[in-house]
Amino acid sequence: MILTTARLNCRPVTVPRLFNRSFSQSFIILKKKSSTPTEKVEEDEIDVNELLKKAETQFKKTLEIQKQKMNEIKQGNFNPKVFNSLVFKNNRKFTDIATTSLKGKNALLITVFDPKDVKTVISGVLAANLNLTPERVPNNDLQLKVSLPPPTTESRLKVAKDLKRVFEEYKQSSLKDSLGTIRGSILKEFKSFKKDDAVRKAERDLEKLHKDYVNKLHDQFQKVEKSIVK
C-alpha cells in the first residue's frame, strides 16, 4: 500500500507542463528584443548611405561651380559679362539699360536700349577703371565698341592669382559650397547615429570621397592655370 500511494502521489506532478509554458514565453520575449536592434542597424545603414550619396552630389556641384567661375576669370575682359556688375546713378544696373556681346576676337559690342543712356554707359565704364574705353559705332546711336588690349605677362599673372584664390575658396572656406563645409556638415549629421561599425565605415568612406574631390578640384585648377601661364 505504501508503494501504491507513492505512485499515486507522483502522477499529479505537472512540472513538465509548467516548464514548457515558461520556456515558450521566454523565447518570444527574447525574439522580440533581439529583432529591434537588428532593424535599427539596418535603418542606420540605409541612412548613412543616403548621407554619402548626398555628400557626393554636393561635391560634384562644387566642382561644376568652380569650373564656371574659373572660365569666367580666364576670359577676363573677353567675358561679355564684364560690365554686368556696374551700377550707375540712381542705382540703375548696367543690365537694366544695356547688354554686351563679343565682336570678333578682340572687341566687345555694347548695345544700349535707349539713346538717352549712352552717355551714362560710357562714363560708367570709364569710371570702373577696367582699362577699357567704349567708342561710338558710326551710324548707330545705340552701339558702343570696346577694343580689348592683348594680354600681358602682368595680366596673365593676375588671372593665375585669381584662379588660385577661387580654388582655395572652394576647397576650404566658409562658403556653403566649399568641399570643407560640405564635409563638416555631413560629419555633423553622422553624430546623430550610434557609433557602430556601419557608421565608422561611412565616416571613412566620406573622408576618402572628400580627398578624391579635393584632388579633382586641384586638377581642374591646374589645367586652367596652365592654359593661362604658358
UniProtKB/Swiss-Prot annotation:
Pfam families: RRF. Keywords: Mitochondrion, Protein biosynthesis, Transit peptide. Its main location: mitochondrion. Signal peptide: none annotated. GO terms for cellular component: mitochondrion. It comes from the Eukaryota. Residues 1-24 form a transit peptide. InterPro entries: Ribosome_recyc_fac, Ribosome_recyc_fac_dom, RRF_sf. GO terms for biological process: mitochondrial translation; translation. It is found in: Mitochondrion. One of its GO terms (molecular function) is ribosomal large subunit binding. Necessary for protein synthesis in mitochondria. Functions as a ribosome recycling factor in mitochondria. Present with 1440 molecules/cell in log phase SD medium. PANTHER family: MITOCHONDRIAL RIBOSOME RECYCLING FACTOR PSEUDO 1, RIBOSOME RECYCLING FACTOR. Belongs to the RRF family. This is Ribosome-recycling factor, mitochondrial. It comes from Saccharomyces cerevisiae (strain ATCC 204508 / S288c).
